[in-house]
Regions:
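Glycine-rich anion/phosphate-binding loops
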Residues: 29, 62-77, 101-112
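Small-aliphatic-rich amphipathic alpha-helix that forms the alpha element of a beta-alpha
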Residues: 67-91, 112-120, 196, 200-203, ...
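Helix N-cap motif at beta-to-alpha junctions
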Residues: 271-277
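Active-site-proximal betaalpha loop/short-helix elements
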Residues: 99-101, 189-264, 304
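Glycine-rich anion-binding loops of enzyme active sites
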Residues: 48, 55, 88-177, 296
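N-terminal glycine-rich anion-binding loops that anchor highly charged ligand groups
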Residues: 30, 35-58, 83-88
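Acidic, Ser/Thr/Pro-rich beta/coil linker or hinge segments at domain junctions
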Residues: 3-4, 8, 237, 284-359
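Beta-strand->loop->alpha-helix junctions that form or flank phosphate-binding loops
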Residues: 27-32, 131, 212, 228-240, ...
Length: 359
């Protein structure tokens, strides 16, 4: 009698998947079909939501070193995309290239992270692919369902709409900073996709995006897609994660850099027409969700916030494009950002000089 696990590859896949919870809608067992077969009851007005993402740069740059976190984030980056469109997850497909000399304990922790993240989000690994190569590369594709055309997109915000976030911002960039600088300062980083909030805000939010690439990238993308500007509330810094502000202070860096970096905290940023704010507050109370107001949409193009009691416009295009430079390292990344900060400070001094002259 043949045994599937007498083949090395089959045995490896069995060992990898044995601790995963099995989806109740999955038809085939392990190895039984070329594609995973699911019993999905799709109604006429329901939609499939599909997204895919890889964990590559974070591993190569040393932001993610812990195998458990790598596994956790492989799932969460995709779940966050589903949350942004108000989808309920069906499952994830995980594709991984493993170095042949990879320590078994590393591999075990990697898949513990994947499995725990799925449990946290109420979903399942429903399939995938495992291969071997020179370096670790891992990605996942997530599938979700939205009901009765109840989905959010990045399009729809209008001047006068109010901006909210599902939680405090900045922890993603603070964590990346500590890892890239190999700092003794430590901050816990284990984001959870805001699936519950994403569904709750449907019908209230006029647009929605996640902060997977950092808050400024999200704000800038909304401005470009909707041809609007954004003005942050005066107390925007109060909406930054407290421990992250301590980290940025230790490094002697301006607080707005917690918004600027492109390693996010996986919150949702969404806009709400002002007449629907009372509904949002009611839902927030009923579902024990904590939405934070952070700004408003305006006609005046640009991204404006208050720094040291003076309103400035951040050059979001320049800030985003800095991250695309070749041969990335922390110093070459921070230098142009600090040059921007210095320019903002000079503009502020010039403003007050002109004000004094006019008196």
């Amino acid at each position: 009698m043949y045994k599937l696990n007498s083949i090395t590859e089959n045995k490896l896949i069995e060992n990898i998947t044995k601790n995963y919870n099995r989806s109740p809608i999955q038809i085939n067992n392990l190895q039984e079909s070329d594609s995973e077969l699911l019993n999905i009851n799709i109604l006429e007005n329901d939609q499939l939501a599909i997204t895919t993402d890889s964990i590559v740069e974070e591993i190569e740059m040393g932001i993610y070193k812990d195998p458990y976190l790598i596994g956790w984030m492989t799932v969460m980056v995709n779940m966050s995309d589903l949350a942004a469109v108000s989808a309920t997850p069906v499952g994830v497909l995980v594709s991984e290239i493993l170095p042949e000399n990879l320590d078994e304990s590393f591999r075990t922790k990697l898949h513990e992270g994947i499995n725990d993240a799925c449990k946290e989000c109420g979903t399942y690994v429903i399939g995938g692919d495992t291969n071997f190569g020179k370096q670790l590369i891992i990605s996942a594709t997530a599938i979700g369902i939205t009901k009765n055309r109840m989905f959010n997109t990045r399009i729809g915000c209008k001047p006068g709409d109010v901006l909210y976030t599902t939680g405090k911002l900045g922890i993603g960039n603070a964590y990346a900073l500590t890892q890239l600088a190999e700092s003794e300062c430590q901050i816990e980083y284990k984001p959870v996709a805001k699936l519950k909030a994403g569904i709750a805000i449907w019908g209230i939010a006029s647009c929605c995006i996640d902060t997977s690439d950092g808050a400024i990238a999200a704000f800038d993308q909304l401005m470009r897609l909707n041809n609007v500007g954004i003005k942050m509330d005066l107390d925007w810094a109060a909406k930054l994660d407290t421990n992250s502000k301590s980290i940025i202070y230790e490094f002697g860096l301006p607080k707005w850099l917690l918004l600027a970096g492109q390693h996010g905290e996986f919150e949702l940023i969404f806009s709400v027409p002002s007449e629907k704010e009372s509904i949002l507050k009611k839902i927030s109370s009923q579902l024990s969700l904590h939405f934070l107001r952070i700004g408003e949409i305006q006609n005046n193009k640009g991204f404006f916030l208050n720094i040291n009691d003076h309103q400035v416009e951040l050059p979001t295009e320049k800030i985003r494009n800095i991250a695309s430079q070749k041969n990335f390292n922390l110093n070459t990344y921070l230098k142009p950002l600090l040059e921007i900060d210095n320019s903002l400070q000079n503009n502020k001094r010039q403003y007050f000089d002109n004000l004094l002259t006019s008196l």
